[in-house]
Design a protein with these regions (language model features):
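N-terminal helix-turn-helix DNA-binding module of bacterial transcription factors
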Residues: 1-47, 318
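Flexible loop/turn connectors
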Residues: 217, 222-320
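Central regulatory/effector-binding core of bacterial HTH transcription factors
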Residues: 70-116
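Short, well-structured alpha-helical segments in soluble
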Residues: 89-102, 210-225
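Flexible loop/hinge segments that line or gate small-molecule binding clefts
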Residues: 86, 109-153, 173-174, 195, ...
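Periplasmic-binding protein-like
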Residues: 102-110, 167-170, 202, 223-233, ...
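Interdomain hinge and pocket-entrance segments immediately C-terminal to HTH DNA-binding domains
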Residues: 34, 43-57, 75-77
């Protein structure tokens, strides 16, 4: 019966599980792929979720994508990814293309967008979840951590350990708002103790171990009195740690180090770099649950989910 075939090919079709399995097995043997355009025309939506992220070249966003994919696995929804390279104009263009396909939802990194992109999100007519950050207003829902609080907590931990002459190493990409907020929170934490950053070293482009080595050598040559280096991410922090160890610098006695993100790469280092977990996989899962209508709150949209990262002192902050 044609109707049974149609229902069997739908994720939530009104047929028994045994019938569905027979239909799907027959389709597999025939190499048949259903044409979903007709259904999309009828519903004015496709079963796609637009996911817009700044990069796939670092270790952060692939784990976010894993969380999204895991949560959407049996919902009939499929994530489609667009990459912005931290460019607001590129984000605007990617969002325009995504929305032209009438997706069932949008997951987008960050809270800062161009006026045109913000207007498109506000008028999307589907669940919109801004991820990775909660330090600011959101269009619909947001899932992430407070980067200002993350920087603040790291500063307090460093000060408790007795470090006083502190340098910051990070990106100078003006559109990396989350790194900027962490630095603002970090400086606020230092100010609580009457301290301030004594030196800063910035880079442009992607994060890499080599960049971390070069930046660490540069800042310590310029300011050898520094006793702590706070890196904006784990990748450059790992490079800094390797440079210090190769040059016989006592870590964490002579100098302490910390990064951010809690990436798995740190498990392979000679010493564990102090870091803070950015809850990447959980952010992906919670965002996808909102889009799929599976939020534990029962709400569809209008949610603000703040996750709490964990500070791991590793082997590079002195024990208090």
């Amino acid at each position: 019966e044609p109707e049974i075939l149609i229902q069997g090919l739908r994720p939530r079709g009104d047929v028994s599980e045994a019938t569905r399995e027979r239909v799907l097995e027959a389709a597999r043997q025939l190499g048949y792929v259903p044409n979903k355009i007709a259904g999309a025309l009828a519903s004015q939506r496709v079963n796609l979720v637009g996911v817009i992220i700044p990069s796939l070249s670092n270790l952060v966003f692939p784990e976010v994508m894993s969380g999204i994919s895991e949560e959407l696995e049996d919902t009939g929804l499929q994530p489609v990814v667009g990459v912005t390279n931290y460019s607001p104009e590129r984000e605007e263009a990617v969002l325009y293309e995504m929305l032209s396909w009438r997706p069932s939802g949008v997951i987008i990194a960050g809270l800062e967008h161009t006026p045109a992109a913000a207007a498109m999100l506000e008028n999307a007519g589907v669940p919109v979840v801004e991820i990775m950050d909660v330090d600011g207003p959101c269009v619909d829902s947001c899932v992430g951590i407070s980067h200002k609080r993350a920087g603040l907590e790291m500063a307090r931990a460093i000060i408790r350990a007795g470090y006083k002459r502190i340098g910051f190493l990070g990106t100078k990409m003006p559109e990396d708002h989350r790194a900027r907020k962490r630095m603002e929170g970090f400086e606020a934490g230092l100010a609580e103790a009457g301290l301030a950053l004594e030196d800063r070293e910035f880079y442009s482009g992607g994060s890499a171990l080599k960049k971390g080595r070069e930046m660490t050598e540069t800042i310590l040559a310029r300011s050898p009195e520094l006793d702590f280096l706070y890196f904006s991410n784990d990748m450059i922090g790992a490079g800094g740690l390797l440079w210090c160890l190769e040059n016989g610098i006592d870590v964490p006695g002579r100098i302490g180090l910390a990064g951010f993100n809690g990436v798995d790469l740190l498990d392979g280092l000679p010493r564990r770099l102090a870091t803070m977990d950015s809850c990447r996989r959980e952010i992906g899962r919670r965002a996808a649950a909102i889009v799929a209508g599976r939020s534990p709150t029962g709400l569809v949209g209008g949610e603000r989910v703040e996750l709490t990262p964990t500070l791991d002192p590793g082997d590079t902050i002195r024990a208090v």
